[in-house]
Curated annotation (Swiss-Prot):
PANTHER family: GLUTAMYL-TRNA GLN AMIDOTRANSFERASE SUBUNIT B MITOCHONDRIAL AND PROKARYOTIC PET112-RELATED, GLUTAMYL-TRNA(GLN) AMIDOTRANSFERASE SUBUNIT B, MITOCHONDRIAL. It comes from Geotalea daltonii (strain DSM 22248 / JCM 15807 / FRC-32) (Geobacter daltonii). This is Aspartyl/glutamyl-tRNA(Asn/Gln) amidotransferase subunit B. Its EC number is 6.3.5.-. The gene is gatB. One of its GO terms (biological process) is translation. Keywords: ATP-binding, Ligase, Nucleotide-binding, Protein biosynthesis. The keyword Nucleotide-binding applies.
Length: 479
């Protein structure tokens, strides 16, 4: 019996506003427990929420970037449930009238394009955090940190259009890239700024009704999402094949074992007893505001990728790599302002710059070689001042010291040798030393030419102009 997976994702995006969604408390990560709270965060009687305008603006940005319709009127609702890290006894969210709906994202998996529907995007507040590890002076008891309570979130809910773990990861990566490009979230998955609930069910091929779904909560890495979904698909198929029934439930993924385990029964919407929050008036968004936000949107990764291919003539692979992060794309474009040859710039950014960043675990924004300095290095190559090989040595010194390339070349004596007399002298010495190889070359072993080039370059310590070396060497060997 063949089965097909049906997957829908609920993604929680923590917004990088300075203050919380309904109060003025800081959202800074890593502060002392319960040091960023107020009567609103703590759910004190009589404390009234005040909506953060920036949160609404960020929600509109997310909606426009994911092809959603922006509701001219939306309302906040109370989602009622009890949990120790929810001080009010309810979460302020949106239910019947979310701010964004009916969107989509297009993904590519193994060269095949697919459109994934987005049901809705709504604003809500985050809950606090339970700390179960040993706490000095407390022992084994669980502790509640309410610093995160009232932190602004967007919940982005997909349609059940995904059919594999690979599709789910492709969708998540694209969504993650968009929210980071927009600047509305840092997307830090380790800190919980971008986390996912995966709804998974399986159905027999040919069936017209979805199977019973489970929800795996708060998976916070692309790798773990893939593992959790693949495990859950296999588990559900095994249960059905053994004659059992899938229980609608909430499950947790254990990254250490790679399996999901039952957490609790899965609630339905009516279990939360949603009703409009009486402390918050309906949110009315004018067309003018939406258009102002639209005009302020940055160029999104898909549009940037296509522009790099169409206008700059870059291969698809280069365009994909360079647009992977907004910071990398900004660095590339800043370099182009000083050196208007896209392909060489792309090669160096993807090659030496990325290598150096990875070796030191640096961000591109912290690179000691600025775009202007990299452009100056490429100009030295174009002028014939240094060879491409020597340029890599110069780059390493620039990275270490922050010096300009011309300064490094001068200090290290790395100027390329193009004088034919000097190069010819080196060639003569090499050919005299390798007389046996010369005889073999002249007897028909043309592949030895590369060997001679290498010997000449080594003898010149990489300074000889490769073009001049090739020209003179060919004449000598054919003479």
């Amino acid at each position: 019996m063949e089965y097909r997976a049906v997957i829908g994702l609920e993604v929680h995006v923590q917004l990088n506003t300075n203050t919380k969604i309904f109060c003025g408390c800081s959202t800074k990560f890593g502060a002392e427990p319960n040091s960023q709270t107020c009567p609103v965060c703590l759910g004190m009687p009589g404390a009234l929420p005040v909506l953060n305008r920036k949160v609404v603006e960020y929600a509109i940005k997310a909606g426009l970037a994911t092809n959603c319709e922006i509701a001219p009127r939306s309302i906040f609702a109370r989602k009622n449930y009890f949990y120790p890290d929810l001080p009010k006894g309810y979460q302020i969210s949106q239910y019947e009238l979310p701010i964004c709906s009916a969107g989509h994202l297009d993904i590519q998996v193994e060269g095949t394009a697919k459109r994934i529907g987005i049901t809705r995007i709504h604003m809500e507040e985050d809950a606090g955090k339970l700390v179960h590890a040993d706490v000095p002076g407390v022992g084994d008891d669980s502790c509640v940190d309410l610093n995160r309570a009232c932190t602004p979130l967007l919940e982005i809910v997909s349609e059940p259009d995904l059919r594999s773990a690979d599709e789910a990861v492709a969708y998540l990566k694209k969504l993650h890239q968009i929210v980071v490009y927009l600047g509305i979230s840092d997307g830090n998955m380790e800190e919980g700024s971008f986390r996912c609930d995966a709804n998974v069910s399986v159905m027999r091929v040919g069936a017209d009704k979805f199977g019973t779904r489970t929800e795996t909560k708060n998976v916070n890495s692309f790798k773990f999402v893939k593992q959790a979904i693949e495990y859950e698909i296999e588990r559900q198929i095994e249960v059905i094949e053994d004659g059992g029934k899938i229980v609608q439930e909430t499950r947790l993924f254990d990254p250490n074992t790679g399996v999901t385990r039952s957490m609790r029964g899965k609630e339905e919407a009516h279990d939360y007893r949603y009703f409009p929050d009486p402390d918050l008036v309906p949110l009315v968004i004018s067309n003018d505001w939406v258009e102002d936000v639209r005009l302020g949107l940055p160029e999104l990764p898909e549009a940037k990728r296509l522009r790099y291919m169409d206008e700059l003539g870059l291969p698809a692979y280069d365009a994909e790599v360079l647009t992977a992060s907004r910071e990398l794309a900004d660095y590339f474009e800043a370099c182009l302002e000083f050196h208007s040859q896209p392909k060489p710039v792309a090669n160096w950014v993807m090659g030496e710059v990325t290598r150096a960043l990875n070796e030191e675990n640096r961000s591109i924004t912290d690179a000691p070689v600025t775009p202007q300095l990299l452009a100056e290095l490429l100009q030295l190559i174009d002028k014939g001042t240094i060879s491409g090989k020597i340029a890599k040595t110069v780059f390493d010194e620039m990275w270490r010291t922050g010096k300009a390339p011309a300064k490094v070349v001068e200090e290290k004596g790395l100027v390329q040798v193009s004088d034919t007399g000097e190069i010819e002298k080196i060639i003569d010495e090499v050919l005299a030393r390798e007389a046996g190889q010369v005889a073999e070359y002249r007897s028909g072993k043309d592949k030895l030419f590369g060997f001679f080039v290498g010997q000449v370059m080594r003898a010149s310590k990489g300074k000889a102009n490769p073009a001049v070396v090739n020209e003179l060497l060919l004449k000598k060997l054919q003479g």
